[in-house]
Regions:
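Glycine-rich, acidic/polar active-site loops that bind/position phosphate-bearing ligands
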Residues: 1-206
Length: 206
């Protein structure tokens, strides 16, 4: 929240990757009334009515965000049927404002279609279906201009030292998603690595 912000600069760039499920009648959109759809695999970045549902909502959301001058940079279908992600890029405080407005617009547009938006980290419980997170990309001038392995590792070590404090600020029920499975690290552990999808922090290839 704004009252926690002491100083922040447009030098700080944030790229948010917000995952979510679309729900209708208490189930993920497109799921059968009983049981589950076929296993995940074809849904991720999928096309075609057998692989994705809700694209009209996604497209209307993207257009509305662009019209509102929100820095939306993309969307994609996620690993479960009815699960999607949108990406927002912003600088400084505006990044957070854009994220919240993008969420609000998404909920409103889904409402027009009789669909609800579920941001719970693990809405399907402890099943073999991925949950929904929000990976956050970050950089500052030093990282963009002269980023190095030493710099990245130094920053990761600093974050690791306050891992438990940080987790407390990230919302409730993350323990249900951060189990060490489904491309996550355990909530009580911290790790980082290059292109490591199971780490707390994934560092791009240098």
């Amino acid at each position: 929240t704004r009252n926690k912000i002491k100083s922040i600069s447009d030098e700080w760039w944030f790229g948010f990757e917000q995952e979510y499920f679309m729900y209708k009648d208490g189930r993920p959109l497109g799921w059968p009334e009983s049981g589950e759809p076929r296993e995940q695999g074809d849904y991720y970045c999928g096309v075609g009515c057998d692989n994705v549902v809700g694209r009209e909502i996604v497209d209307r959301h993207t257009e509305a965000c662009m019209n509102a001058e929100i820095g939306i940079t993309g969307t994609n279908a996620e690993v479960a049927l009815g699960q999607w992600e949108f990406q927002v890029l912003g600088k400084g405080v505006k990044a957070g404002d854009d994220l919240w407005m993008a969420r609000y617009i998404l909920v409103k547009i889904a409402e027009w279609h009789g669909v609800s938006i579920n941001l719970h980290p693990k809405p399907l419980g402890q099943t073999d279906w991925n949950g929904s997170g929000m990976h956050t990309n970050f950089s500052n001038n030093k990282m963009r201009d002269s980023g190095s392995e030493v710099l990245m590792e130094h920053m990761c070590e600093k974050l690791g030292a306050v891992h438990s404090e940080g987790i407390k600020e990230y919302g409730s029920d993350n323990d249900q998603r951060l189990t060490g499975l489904h491309e996550t690290q355990s909530i009580d552990q911290f790790s980082y690595g290059v292109s490591d999808r199971g780490a707390s922090i994934r560092i791009p290839i240098y």
